[in-house]
Structure formats: C-alpha cells, structure tokens
Amino acid sequence: MTKTKTKKAKKSRRNIALTAVSGVVLGLTLPLTATASTAPTALRAKPLDWTKCEGSGFGPRQECATVDVPMDYADPEGEKIGIAVSRIRSEKPAVRRGVLLLIPGGPGGSSLEEQSAKARTLPREVREAYDLVVFDPRGNGRSAPVSCGFEQRDLAATAFRPWPVGPDGSVAGNLTAARRMAGACERNGGELLRHIDTVANARDVDRIRAALGERKLSAWGVSYGSYLGAVYNELFPHRTDRFVLDSNLDANADAHGGQVARGLWAGFEQGVEDVFPEFAKWASEPGNPYRLADTAAEVRPVFLRLAARLDREPIPWPGAIPAELNGNVLRQSLLDAFYDPEGFPAAARLILAAREGTVPPAPEPPPEALLQNGLAVASATFCNEGKWPASAARYQKEVDESRAKYPLTAGMPRNATLCAAWPYPPKQDSVRITDRGPSTVLMVQNERDPAAPLAGARELRAALGKRAVMVTVNATGHDAYLGNGNACGDAAVTRYLATGERPARDTYCR
C-alpha cells in the first residue's frame, strides 16, 4: 500500500465526517447482555442475497446486500429497516480466517462507497486473511436515510458544533438554535430518528455478523467507530475475534453524567491544545510561504487576537456558510485543519488573508442532502443517549470556565447542542465499558489528535483493563492506522489483524 492511496481514501471520508460532526460523537428495557441478544439473532438470521453493487465508487469484485433489522429492538417483531452492507471476498480463500468489519466514524456522513475505498487500501496480508465488509449504519446513506430538514443557517459547521453565538460567550443564541433545530427533527425526522443510538448500532453489527454466518467478528473501528466497537465488545464479548480501535474516544460515562457524548464534545478542548504546538512550530519555520510569526510562541497570540477581532468585525465571505468570516468560523477552520497536518497550509492561508481584511474563495460545500442526512444521524445518536442538561445557567457556567482555560475552543465543547431541547425521552444512559470479557482489543492512538485526545484514549484503555493493549503513536492528526500515524503503529496493527500477534504490553511508537 502506498501512503498516497491511503491518504486519498482517508481524506475523502474525513471531509464528510468533518462536515457532519467530526469525529467526534449515543435502547432497551432488557438487560444488555450477550446471553439475551446473540443466540436469538443467530437463529433468525437469513442468508444474504448478494448482488453487484450499483453506483460509482465500487470495485469490480465488490458485492452488496441488505440485512433486515428491527427499527426498535424493544419490539423485535415490529417494523424492519434495511442495513446496507458490502463485501470484498478474501484475495486468497485458502488462508481466509473470517470477516473484518470496518466500523465508520462520524456518527453520520460516511458512505458505503467511501468505506469500500478505505477497505481496498488495507495491506495484502489483511486482504487475504479476511472478507472485507463495510456497512452504512442505520439512518445513514443507503440504510433508511433520515433527515431533519434543517434550515440553511443550521447546516454550518459552526451551528452544529455549538460555538457561542456572541463575542462575550453568551449561550442564549445557542439555546434558541437548539430549540429551532430540535423542532425540525420532531417535525421532519420520522419514527426511525427515535431509534438511532449506539446500542442499536451495536445490535445491528451483531445482526450483520449472524447474517454473514460468522461465529465471531473481527473489526476496525475509527473515531466514533472506536466507541461503537467498545460497546459491541461489552454487549457481545464472546462474539469478538480481533478488534482494532483507532483514534479512541473517551468512553468514561461516569465522568459525564452518564453521557459519553458530552465527554466526546469536551475532548476538543484538550485535543486542539495538544495539536496547536505542532501547528505553531510549522507556522513559524523560516522559509515557510505561510509563515505567521517569527517564533512558535508568537503564533498563539496572533491567532487569538485575530479571532477576537473577527468576533467584533466579521469579513463578508460570499458563497460560504455562514456568509462571513467571523471568529468562530476561524476557530472552526483551525480545528478542521488539525485533523490532518496536510491541512495546516489551508488554515494559515485563511489567517493571512483575514489579517489583511480579505478572504480566499469560499470552499464548495458538500451536497445538501448529504449534510442533512449526516447531521440528523449525528443528532439522534448523541441526543437519544441520556438526559441532557437544559439549564441555561449551567451551560453558561461551563462555557465561561472553558473559555478561560481553553481559549482556542472558546467554550464550544461545553455549550448547548440541540440535545438540550431534544423532544424525545432518552433511551438509556451510555453503556459502561468494563474489563469483563476476552482479551481481543488492540488500541492504536496518535499522541496529538484534535478530536480524540490521548487523555480520552487512556480513559478507554483503563476501562478495558486486561482486555486491551494500546499502541501510542508519536504522530499528529486523526485516524492513526494507514492515515496520520507512522510505520511502527501501522505495522503493529497489520501484524495483529493478519497473525493475531499483539505487543505484550502497552507500547510507544516513535
């Protein structure tokens, strides 16, 4: 595999994920145990009807099918929805050992075509060892897609990511937007919106496993997919074979009032701080055509002063959403650039233009239908899990504290999302990840990740205990394996998937 190919596949899916929610991030009345859920699934599984995949972006060896699952697992005999899946058979059937499921991030915004391109970048020994299977999670893409019909202004990344509306950090405008967006979901989202959450996604994954006729499942989950993979390991521990969790999210629900999603948002505070020194070092290098300052120490005040100025005096930006370059758009653009160091030049160009009172050409937005679908899936996944705070005073206090401690993110990670006004009762609290079950997990984690900071990955590592080994990679950006990691980390993951050999203990890849 060449780095160029893997980068292209990764960037394609990253751009869509960023538009929807970035990586960052989720019901049942019966006990969430493997005993209650795995055996009946296996008995009811129907053989899949594989056909040629329709549409562009699929390889010639690729097959597509649909797995029928309950819309509501509390009513398993009720209405069904179809989960779109795709398969690329092992390139060497004589050594095939099972299925490797690619679990996408988001949540929301991925597509079967993009995940398929990612599968084709895997090293030869992995492509030989497994049938590679990808899927669109419920409500997403080809799997009964949902939409809230958000207003145009609410499709901006600075709207879904709740940057404080006013330059003083007031949350009042965000709560108004939350009510407007939640109302759109209630009017337009349909019944499925109430049944999109991480536990339902995990049960869908087990339905896919059963429909494939596999006793156990191997998987590679990235970003939100790392959390979904951890939940699957918790609910179906004896169905797991080799699991790779990549760019790991903080799954410590106890620290966030029973809600993993609030912790995922909060992770941006530390994640952006972790990456900024690398950006500052790059942006102060002599000879850099996008140099922002003479020293790395000067880059931070340059950025903060400019963001504050744009809060007060935004620059018109025709064609952009929103149609101005304000302080929050600048902050959001920097955060997006931090997902991949190759994005540093774009962020620096924007900063240089804004300092002169100008803007570059507006980036072309993704198709509106894709945005609407991704945002609706992300909203439901987050909001259906746990009861979110609704108090303006609580949000204001947390935002004020965050702005003081983490000025680069200006309070956004602690602000009110549309979940503060979500019209439906929560399905359940987040699943508590434990160390109970077989040792089948290899975690791979970049040291500097804006959306999945190392501190959060360590929380997940501690929760998994003896079930996991973690490889920490001396690298910057989101997506470690075959993305923004390094050769040492890539080799460790490939070796585990192909041979089952994991490092004996937690490892640091320089």
Question: Which residues make up each language-model segment?
Answer:
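Secretory targeting and sorting signals
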Residues: 1-38, 67, 205
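Generic hydrophobic alpha-helical segments
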Residues: 350-351, 493
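Long, low-complexity segments enriched in small/aliphatic residues
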Residues: 351-386, 390-393
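Gly/Pro-rich cap/lid or specificity-loop segments adjacent to the active site
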Residues: 40-329, 380-510
